[in-house]
Amino acid sequence: MHEPRLWVKRLVIWEKPGEQPLRDVPLRPGLNIVWTPDDNGIGHGGGKTLFCRLLRYCLGEDKFAPEDQRDGIGSAFPNGWVGMEVVLDGTCWAVLRPLGIRRRHFAVPNGNLDELILSEMPTTGLSPLLNSIEDNLLTPGVRDLIAGKKQGH
C-alpha cells in the first residue's frame, strides 16, 4: 500500500511552550473518524469543528475561528500554540502557529514538533510548506488559476 502524497500525521495543542500538550491527536493515512462521546444526545461542544479549523489553520488559513471565538481562545490561552505534522511526498513537516497573541509562525521540513515548540529558531512563516505543496502537488493549470487570484483577476 502506498502512502498518500499529502496527509496529516498529528495535531497538537499546547497551553504554553514547555508544558505537556493539552491535546495530542495522532492521525493515520486514509480515513480518520473524528467523534466525541455524546452525553447530551446532540453532539455539540466536543470540539470537532474547531479541530477541523485548526487543521486548516496549520495548512495556511488565516484564522482558526470566528473573531469572537478567537478572542475567547486567545484570552484563555495567551501563550497557546497549535502544531501539526504533515507529510508531503514522504517528508514530514513540522508546522507551528500561535493561538493567543501574535507570534511567529513556522513550517520546517524534517522538523520535530516537540523540539520546535521549545526552540528559539528564526521565524520561517508558512511559505516554505505552502510553496512546496504548490510546487509538488498542483498541476500547472491550478497553479495558474491560483496566481490569477493572487493578482486580483
Residues of each region from the PLM?
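Extreme N-terminal "head/tail" segments of very large remodeling/mechanoenzyme assemblies
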Residues: 1-97, 105
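Glycine-rich phosphate-binding loops of NTPases
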Residues: 101-153
